[in-house]
Amino acid sequence: MIFATLEHILTHISFSIISIVITTHLMTFAREIAGLSDLSEKGMIAVFLRITGLLVTRWIYSGHLPLSNLYESLIFLSWGFSLIHMISKIQNHKNFLSSITAPSAILTQGFVTSGLLTEMHQSAILVPALQSHWLIMHVSMMLLSYAALLCGSLLSIALLVITFRKKLDIIFLLIRLFSFGEIQYLNEKRSILQNTSFSFRNYHKYQLTQQLDHWSYRVIGIGFTLLTLGILSGAVWANEAWGSYWNWDPKETWAFITWTISAIYLHTRTNKNLQSANSAIVASIGFLIIWICYFGVNLLGIGLHSYGSFALR
């Protein structure tokens, strides 16, 4: 009873802190405000510690690592977003991941808190298929890979949005240049100033897209490595539990598709002609594939991984 109460308190405290963090991120996204950035970072540290405490509490209470159903896996996924945020800030204080990880954490935590049936919050005895030491290795690697791949895909989507808007700006400028024949001196002067301003904005957008492409590549590369480890450990576990390394059930099939899309993305990044926007399109497709892989089997409730099926409120 004490552990259940503590878990309930930690869940709502984490959600409240993440709400404050995302609010400060939105306030400082367009304009740097002294003090709020530090408050946001301290908030993410607090979120990470409290979600860690929540997982440890549930682990002690249930006697196993909390990765047995959708509720527990979503908590771990939220923890994964927070972990990526912490690591990225340690390596490089200024990057774009914080604008992705904080909203991802709050949406995940919000769905955990209010989107699932209360019965799913209760810890249950592991089904025989999950009573293995491979649970920690396989499921944790898969969920951490999902967190990394989702963050990298969102960065690529942001890159596509900026690139698309940049191309629209160029088209609008060309229309303006060819729409007027002779322009008087004052209009020419104003046009030069506008073109100079446009060039500066264009250079800034170029730098921004390069940074987004760089971080997307790094994060997806990490996610691909974790996904590979998760699939390999799952194959070994499947051989022990079911006598076969691979069975092509829905979860395994979509995991393989996710791995393939990630591999294609990494391959396109090695070709200079396919970098940036072209590779970002592949990563954006991967964003949808990852969610199908994660939720698809739970919605269908079929296959060897169907023990995690769920119902919404």
Curated annotation (Swiss-Prot):
NCBIfam families: cytochr_II_ccsB (TIGR03144). GO terms for cellular component: chloroplast thylakoid membrane. HAMAP family: CytC_CcsA. Pfam families: Cytochrom_C_asm. The gene is ccsA. Required during biogenesis of c-type cytochromes (cytochrome c6 and cytochrome f) at the step of heme attachment. It comes from Amborella trichopoda. This is Cytochrome c biogenesis protein CcsA. Belongs to the CcmF/CycK/Ccl1/NrfE/CcsA family.
